[in-house]
Protein backbone atom coordinates (compact mmCIF):
# COMPACT_ATOMS: atom_id res chain seq x y z
CA UNK A 1 0.00 0.00 0.00
CA UNK A 2 1.55 3.31 -0.99
CA UNK A 3 1.70 6.10 1.51
CA UNK A 4 1.70 9.83 1.13
CA UNK A 5 -1.07 12.24 1.89
CA UNK A 6 -3.52 10.05 -0.04
CA UNK A 7 -3.15 7.27 2.53
CA UNK A 8 -3.50 9.72 5.41
CA UNK A 9 -6.49 11.55 3.89
CA UNK A 10 -8.24 9.33 1.32
CA UNK A 11 -7.59 5.79 2.57
CA UNK A 12 -8.13 6.91 6.15
CA UNK A 13 -8.83 9.92 8.31
CA UNK A 14 -5.38 9.72 9.92
CA UNK A 15 -4.34 13.21 8.76
CA UNK A 16 -7.26 14.83 10.58
CA UNK A 17 -7.96 12.40 13.43
CA UNK A 18 -4.63 10.73 14.28
CA UNK A 19 -5.08 7.79 16.65
CA UNK A 20 -8.88 8.10 16.44
CA UNK A 21 -8.85 7.66 12.65
CA UNK A 22 -11.04 5.42 10.55
CA UNK A 23 -9.68 3.31 7.67
CA UNK A 24 -11.39 2.92 4.30
CA UNK A 25 -13.66 -0.14 4.51
CA UNK A 26 -12.46 -1.62 1.22
CA UNK A 27 -8.80 -1.33 2.22
CA UNK A 28 -9.54 -2.87 5.60
CA UNK A 29 -11.51 -5.75 4.04
CA UNK A 30 -8.76 -6.43 1.50
CA UNK A 31 -5.97 -6.38 4.09
CA UNK A 32 -7.90 -8.66 6.44
CA UNK A 33 -8.74 -11.11 3.65
CA UNK A 34 -5.13 -11.23 2.48
CA UNK A 35 -3.89 -11.79 6.03
CA UNK A 36 -6.44 -14.54 6.64
CA UNK A 37 -5.30 -16.21 3.41
CA UNK A 38 -1.68 -16.11 4.60
CA UNK A 39 -0.63 -13.56 2.00
CA UNK A 40 2.04 -10.97 2.82
CA UNK A 41 1.31 -7.25 2.98
CA UNK A 42 3.59 -4.30 2.22
CA UNK A 43 2.88 -0.79 3.54
CA UNK A 44 5.11 2.24 2.94
CA UNK A 45 5.54 5.83 4.07
CA UNK A 46 2.63 6.87 6.36
CA UNK A 47 0.46 3.88 5.32
CA UNK A 48 1.84 1.64 8.13
CA UNK A 49 0.09 3.98 10.59
CA UNK A 50 -3.19 2.48 9.35
CA UNK A 51 -2.24 -1.06 10.36
CA UNK A 52 -3.21 -0.79 14.05
CA UNK A 53 -6.72 0.22 12.96
CA UNK A 54 -6.97 -2.59 10.42
CA UNK A 55 -5.84 -5.39 12.73
CA UNK A 56 -7.01 -6.06 16.27
CA UNK A 57 -3.58 -7.26 17.39
CA UNK A 58 -0.17 -5.57 17.70
CA UNK A 59 2.14 -5.53 14.70
CA UNK A 60 5.83 -4.58 14.37
CA UNK A 61 5.90 -1.65 11.95
CA UNK A 62 7.91 1.42 11.01
CA UNK A 63 7.18 4.92 9.84
CA UNK A 64 10.87 5.78 10.09
CA UNK A 65 12.25 7.94 12.89
CA UNK A 66 9.56 10.59 13.42
CA UNK A 67 9.00 10.35 17.18
CA UNK A 68 5.63 12.13 17.20
CA UNK A 69 4.12 9.79 14.60
CA UNK A 70 5.77 6.80 16.28
CA UNK A 71 4.08 7.78 19.55
CA UNK A 72 0.71 7.92 17.79
CA UNK A 73 1.05 4.46 16.21
CA UNK A 74 2.19 3.01 19.53
CA UNK A 75 -0.81 4.63 21.22
CA UNK A 76 -2.93 2.84 18.59
CA UNK A 77 -1.40 -0.52 19.58
CA UNK A 78 1.51 -1.09 17.21
CA UNK A 79 5.13 -1.75 18.12
CA UNK A 80 7.08 0.95 16.29
CA UNK A 81 10.61 0.07 15.22
CA UNK A 82 12.84 3.00 14.18
CA UNK A 83 14.19 2.38 10.68
CA UNK A 84 16.36 4.26 8.17
CA UNK A 85 14.97 5.23 4.77
CA UNK A 86 16.86 2.46 2.97
CA UNK A 87 15.61 -0.43 5.08
CA UNK A 88 12.49 -2.36 6.07
CA UNK A 89 10.85 -3.75 9.19
CA UNK A 90 9.32 -7.21 8.90
CA UNK A 91 6.69 -8.64 11.21
CA UNK A 92 7.51 -12.25 10.34
CA UNK A 93 4.63 -13.79 12.26
CA UNK A 94 2.02 -11.70 10.45
CA UNK A 95 3.84 -11.36 7.11
CA UNK A 96 3.72 -7.55 7.18
CA UNK A 97 6.57 -5.54 5.67
CA UNK A 98 6.93 -1.77 6.16
CA UNK A 99 9.38 0.91 5.04
CA UNK A 100 9.61 4.66 5.77
CA UNK A 101 9.89 5.84 2.13
CA UNK A 102 9.03 9.55 2.00
CA UNK A 103 8.62 9.80 5.77
CA UNK A 104 12.43 10.17 5.56
CA UNK A 105 13.47 10.25 1.89
CA UNK A 106 14.76 13.46 0.42
CA UNK A 107 14.60 12.11 -3.13
CA UNK A 108 13.22 9.20 -5.12
CA UNK A 109 16.54 7.32 -5.09
CA UNK A 110 16.51 7.21 -1.29
CA UNK A 111 12.90 6.04 -1.21
CA UNK A 112 13.51 3.47 -3.94
CA UNK A 113 16.10 1.54 -1.93
CA UNK A 114 13.69 0.76 0.91
CA UNK A 115 10.74 0.23 -1.44
CA UNK A 116 12.73 -2.26 -3.53
CA UNK A 117 13.63 -4.17 -0.35
CA UNK A 118 9.96 -4.16 0.67
CA UNK A 119 8.85 -5.55 -2.70
CA UNK A 120 11.55 -8.24 -2.64
CA UNK A 121 10.59 -9.33 0.87
CA UNK A 122 6.86 -9.39 0.08
CA UNK A 123 7.61 -11.59 -2.94
CA UNK A 124 9.83 -13.86 -0.84
CA UNK A 125 7.10 -14.22 1.78
CA UNK A 126 4.68 -15.14 -1.02
CA UNK A 127 6.71 -18.18 -2.03
Predicted regions and their residues:
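Active-site-adjacent pocket-lining segments in enzyme domains
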Residues: 1-127
Amino acid sequence: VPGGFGAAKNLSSFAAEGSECQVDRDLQALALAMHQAGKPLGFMCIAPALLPKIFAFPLRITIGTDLDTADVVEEMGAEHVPCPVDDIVVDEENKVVTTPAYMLAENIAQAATGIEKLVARVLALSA
